[in-house]
């Protein structure tokens, strides 16, 4: 628990130094592993943005994946997954927006609109779109139109799933487009 408190203090200090006018919070919660996803989802629902590290890789456990999925699918709020090296700025100029035509993806895209509007470019990334479905001829096209109507500069990238995890494909694409 002491390590968690130290991490909380360090995160609060880092956030305060990055954007002094930003109103934010970092919370420590003690819970059973089985209830962790419910706690994360409940906190995420009343947040404007959830910031998490990549759930896979060295030093990551099964709880990291569960936390990310709870925030993404149950939290109904935008989730910013920070790459291992961190972010160069608190206001990114290029945003990669994962799109799979799901309700959760649409809710997250709508709620992320303030962030998307401030970006210079939003890359809508569709990985292995379905061969049959309403967007089969133009995957991500309808979302792109929605974003453009809101003043967002957006384009669609359709990628093949060439790595075991979708998150790895997204992370690689984010690095590729800087």
Describe the role of every protein-language-model region.
Residues 1-17:
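Conserved N-terminal ligand/cofactor-binding loop architecture of enzyme catalytic domains
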Residues 13-50, 149-178:
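Structural beta-alpha unit
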Residues 31-34, 56-58, 128-131:
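A short, flexible beta-alpha/helix-coil linker loop
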């Amino acid at each position: 628990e002491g390590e968690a408190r130290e991490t909380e203090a360090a995160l609060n200090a880092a956030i305060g130094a990055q954007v002094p006018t930003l109103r934010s919070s970092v919370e420590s919660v003690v819970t059973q592993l089985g209830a962790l996803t419910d706690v994360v989802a409940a906190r995420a629902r009343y947040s404007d943005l959830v910031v998490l590290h990549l759930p896979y890789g060295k030093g990551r456990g099964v709880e990291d994946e569960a936390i990310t999925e709870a925030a993404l699918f149950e939290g109904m709020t935008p989730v910013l997954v920070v790459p291992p090296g961190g972010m160069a700025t608190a206001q990114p100029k290029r945003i990669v927006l994962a799109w799979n035509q799901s309700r959760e993806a649409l809710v997250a895209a709508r709620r992320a609109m303030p962030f998307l509007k401030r970006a210079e470019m939003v890359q809508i990334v569709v990985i292995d779109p379905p061969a049959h479905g309403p967007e089969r001829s133009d995957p991500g096209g309808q979302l792109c139109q929605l974003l453009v109507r809101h003043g967002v500069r957006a384009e669609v990238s359709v990628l093949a799933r060439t790595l075991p995890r979708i998150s790895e494909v997204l992370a690689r694409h984010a690095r590729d487009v800087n």
